[in-house]
Regions:
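Low-complexity, glycine- and small/polar-enriched segments
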Residues: 1-277
Length: 277
């Protein structure tokens, strides 16, 4: 409308960066979120329009008997509402990275029913570039939208000095990576490239104690995960579910990577259209 903000320049650059490192805390929640949101107004760039959002988080610990860390990272760009953008070229780039490492040693338990070592690492990582709503984007030349997600998660429970007890290593990872045009957004460009990439490296290790373990005690982390319907039912033998473990390692990975055009309005590309995921 008439009161909507207008930005006009030769080259226009928007940048959001967030980083955090909490790699030495027993219980940690490192979170890094970098977001760019455009929900209206007019942007006129005689040259380039560029937006970059980058979020990177590191969490973990070493040489301690118990580690529970939740690491969150996000780099996201969202252009929606009634936004109007006119530019000679456009580059939207979102990046998210997580490095988590939990390397625990012994709890020195007082019984074979107790936890001997526990390493639990949860990772949530999001990298998205999205044009939606009623946005109208006109780019004379090259328009690119990219999203890159990199996750490294390492959880190791090694009860080196414990004579008995169970060790538990858990990795829970959720990854969302997307470069999308959706809603009622209308895009016109000389060429258009949408690129979404995900890389995940997960290492999991739980080592049994020399003396082994008995049925885990109530309230122990091992008992908690054996009782969890999402995980406990997966630990089975030919005789049924498992109620006693010397070492338990659980890896739970859900990852989505998308690049696409799903708008109800027309997307017009004079030259090359490149979608990669």
């Amino acid at each position: 409308g008439a009161d909507a903000p207008v930005i006009s320049a030769g080259n226009i650059t928007l940048q959001a960066t967030a980083s955090v490192d909490q790699a030495s805390l027993l219980l940690a929640l490192p979170t890094a979120r970098a977001q760019i949101r455009i929900n209206g107004g007019q942007i006129d760039a005689a040259g380039s329009f560029a937006a970059t959002a980058s979020g990177n988080a590191a969490g973990g610990l070493t040489l301690l008997p118990l580690g529970v860390v939740v690491t969150n990272a996000e780099g996201s760009i969202a252009i929606g509402g009634d936004t109007r953008i006119d530019a000679a070229s456009m580059a939207l780039s979102a990046q998210s990275g997580v490095t988590a490492a939990i390397l625990t040693e012994s709890l020195a338990p007082d019984s074979s029913a107790a936890d001997a070592a526990v390493a639990i690492s949860t990772v949530n990582s999001t990298a998205t570039t999205r044009i939606d709503g009623n946005a109208q984007i006109t780019v004379a030349g090259v328009a690119t939208m990219s999203a890159e997600n990199t996750v490294t998660n390492r959880a190791e429970a090694t009860p080196d000095t414990a004579a008995f007890g169970a060790s538990l290593a858990v990795s829970v990872v959720r990854i969302d990576t997307a470069a999308e045009i959706a809603g009622d957004a209308r895009v016109q460009a000389g060429s258009l490239g949408l690129d979404a990439r995900t890389a995940a490296d997960i290492t999991l290790r739980a080592a049994a104690t020399e003396g082994g373990a008995t049925a885990p005690a109530e309230g122990s982390k091992t008992q908690q995960y054996l009782d969890d319907p999402a995980y406990g039912q997966q630990a089975t033998t030919s005789e049924g579910t498992v109620s006693v473990v010397g070492a338990l390692a659980i890896s739970d990975l859900v990852s989505s990577t998308r690049a696409g055009v799903d708008s109800t309005a027309q997307t017009t590309v004079a030259g090359a259209l490149d979608l990669q995921a």
